């Protein structure tokens, strides 16, 4: 059975170092797709690079934890900025869901304005779209527009909660992350998906070159390690040997 493998690089538009790392991992490695933060400092640079790479699938990385929102969000921001206090608000069930739904629509329109096309799919920074209060908003939004959505089926949900016309991969992994990033780790993810009988799999990654913005991230130098692994010729060969076809969310 042929299996579709989507290797999606998150954080396109975060910084020029991030952008160049993603492009390097696409041109000379196994990355096939990316998702862009429309409020990122280097989003225009990302859009410029993407125009030179029309086959690179570009989706939208919905942001509720970093930087300035596109719309006014007095119920979620502090001093005009988004932040990780969203976790506490989710636990207390005090999320401003109307503001979040409006911000999603505004970020989506901003993506179209910057990239000149609709995103191939949606996911989110720090996986906030998987919060039980937020997931129905994002799932409905994606289904209405006919675009795919990253779904971590281990954290949500039974299938009855999903819109019938919502597209996603059968499998998703965030395990290629952290301090122990190796080719063996990547291949274990593929082998586990094969064992589950999944016909499509998304693997999340964050390849980057380190610049001043990336240095401010709690997840900094492992991004360079990811880039090294993802551009390994032996990894590309091992993926092909396992019967995976590289693809984007347009292939599911």
Swiss-Prot record:
Source organism (scientific name): Salmonella paratyphi C (strain RKS4594)
SUPFAM superfamilies linked to this entry: Glycoside hydrolase/deacetylase
Cofactors required: Mg(2+)
Any single GO BP term: diacetylchitobiose catabolic process
Role: Involved in the degradation of chitin. ChbG is essential for growth on the acetylated chitooligosaccharides chitobiose and chitotriose but is dispensable for growth on cellobiose and chitosan dimer, the deacetylated form of chitobiose. Deacetylation of chitobiose-6-P and chitotriose-6-P is necessary for both the activation of the chb promoter by the regulatory protein ChbR and the hydrolysis of phosphorylated beta-glucosides by the phospho-beta-glucosidase ChbF.
Main location class: cytoplasm
Keyword check for Oxidoreductase: no
UniProt subcellular location: Cytoplasm
Assembly description: Homodimer.
Residues noted as binding Mg(2+) in the record, renumbered to the chain: 61, 125
Family annotation (Pfam families): YdjC (PF04794)
Main enzyme class: hydrolase
Any one Gene Ontology cellular component term annotated for this protein: cytoplasm
One GO MF term attached to the UniProt entry: metal ion binding
Gene label: chbG
Keyword Magnesium: yes
Pathway info: Glycan degradation; chitin degradation
CDD domains membership: YdjC_EF3048_like
Record-annotated membrane-spanning stretches: none
Record's signal peptide: none
Family affiliation: Belongs to the YdjC deacetylase family. ChbG subfamily.
Protein's name in the database: Chitooligosaccharide deacetylase
Catalysed reactions, as listed in the record: N,N'-diacetylchitobiose + H2O = N-acetyl-beta-D-glucosaminyl-(1->4)-D-glucosamine + acetate; diacetylchitobiose-6'-phosphate + H2O = N'-monoacetylchitobiose-6'-phosphate + acetate
EC number: 3.5.1.105
Keywords tagged on the record: Carbohydrate metabolism, Chitin degradation, Cytoplasm, Hydrolase, Magnesium, Metal-binding, Polysaccharide degradation
Domain of life the protein comes from: Bacteria
